[in-house]
Amino acid sequence: MPGLRAALPAALLLLSSFPPAAAERLPWPQVPGVMRPLNPSHREAVWAAWTALHYINSHEASPSRPLALHKVVKAASKMIPRLGWKYYVHCTTEGYIHGENAGSCFATVLYLKKSPPVVHGKCVHAQNKKQIQEEDHRFYEYLQHQKKPITANYIPDSNGNIAHDHLQLWGLAIVGSSYIMWKQSTEHTGYLLAQVSSVKQQIRKDNAVAFKFIVLLHEIPTQQLNVCHMYLVWTLGHPIRVKYSCAPDNHGLEDGSGQDSGSAAGTSHETKGNF
């Protein structure tokens, strides 16, 4: 069956074009506790919206219809004394896989200095939620009944194409990677899923499904690619459970070996997760 071309959401292209944080200056004094409006296209507004969607994707755990940012409609921020910056965003969303209209979300994102961002969000879905749940259920049952582990490499391929049979695996990778990207995001550093280098199912005897992924995450604004080894466990109706370790990829996207090691801001050799 012909593959589908993986088109980056417009908001991803906008995000990757932003200059480093030092190149921008806020046009007002940074007064603690004072709410300040943000230009919806401002880098921090877009990053806060993506941070919220990473959190929502990892907790809703729907590989059939993960969410991507379409655009930020309205945004504001304020400094919370002794904690950090808190962002308030209203954004429209689209399907991460197909780019269809997916609704809108309201969220707050509090960036802490030594902990993952604290996110509270609520989304209004344009799609039929029951249909999404049924698609997830069919995919889940399909995975549960596998006698031979599912394996795949390079999703999307070097031409940006995704085979139809790999679309939901790509969706599952988005959901799992969203957990990592939420945990690693800061006020000035964001992440996007660039490619699944490899994926292999781990056959289990319980009612969960599990996969080992090697994924490439695009770090913004450094443009660095980070290799993450991700062990994902999915139980239908529950948030994804993820263990991961990440390091820079020195060979680039097309190599996809995921075997290099190193260190960088926002990445770690130490295995982390929510098990």
Swiss-Prot record:
Residues 32-131, 151-255 form the Cystatin LXN-type domain. It holds the Pfam family LXN. GO terms for molecular function: metalloendopeptidase inhibitor activity. One of its GO terms (cellular component) is extracellular space. Residues 254-275 are annotated as: Disordered. The keyword DNA damage does not apply. Expressed at high levels in the uterine and isthmus regions of the oviduct, and concentrated in the eggshell. It is found in: Secreted. Residues 1-23 form the signal peptide. InterPro entries: CYSTATIN_LXN (IPR049897), Cystatin_sf (IPR046350), Latexin (IPR009684). Residues 256-268 have a biased composition (Low complexity). GO terms for biological process: biomineral tissue development. Keywords: Biomineralization, Protease inhibitor, Repeat, Secreted, Signal. Component of the matrix of the eggshell. Belongs to the protease inhibitor I47 (latexin) family. This is Ovocalyxin-32. It comes from Gallus gallus. The lineage of its organism: Eukaryota, Metazoa, Chordata, Craniata, Vertebrata.
